[in-house]
Amino acid sequence: MNKLIDEITKSQLNPDVPSFRPGDTVRVHAKVVEGTRERIQLFEGVVIKRRGAGISETFTVRKISNGVGVERTFPVHTPRIAKLEVIRRGKVRRAKLYYLRNLRGKAARIKEIR
């Protein structure tokens, strides 16, 4: 039974996901359905967490929009993500970057890996 679940799960995984970690700046091209129309919505920000494994793996992206912090959680292997681009690699020493919620302006910057 376990092998069957593993095979089904493996067939649902998206092989086109680039490697990314917390601290990286990513641009997510998410498919949004509005009525009968479907369009692509961009969401660019810093990955503040990545959790889970396999088909249930998710990541959270944080950005500042009009002075307000916005966080959005995406499943890694969802067909609703048309494309996932890594814009820059960040150097952090934590797996969960919740401390960024309390920082403003230049204090919230993350060093880039060269």
Swiss-Prot record:
InterPro entries: Ribosomal_bL19, Ribosomal_bL19_CS, Ribosomal_bL19_sf, Translation_prot_SH3-like_sf
Domain of life: Bacteria
GO biological process: translation
PROSITE patterns according to UniProt: RIBOSOMAL_L19
MF terms in GO: structural constituent of ribosome
Keywords (A to Z) from UniProt: Ribonucleoprotein, Ribosomal protein
Any single Gene Ontology cellular-component annotation: cytosolic large ribosomal subunit
Record function comment: This protein is located at the 30S-50S ribosomal subunit interface and may play a role in the structure and function of the aminoacyl-tRNA binding site.
Matches recorded under NCBIfam families: rplS_bact (TIGR01024)
Recorded family membership: Belongs to the bacterial ribosomal protein bL19 family.
Name of protein: Large ribosomal subunit protein bL19
Protein's organism: Listeria innocua serovar 6a (strain ATCC BAA-680 / CLIP 11262)
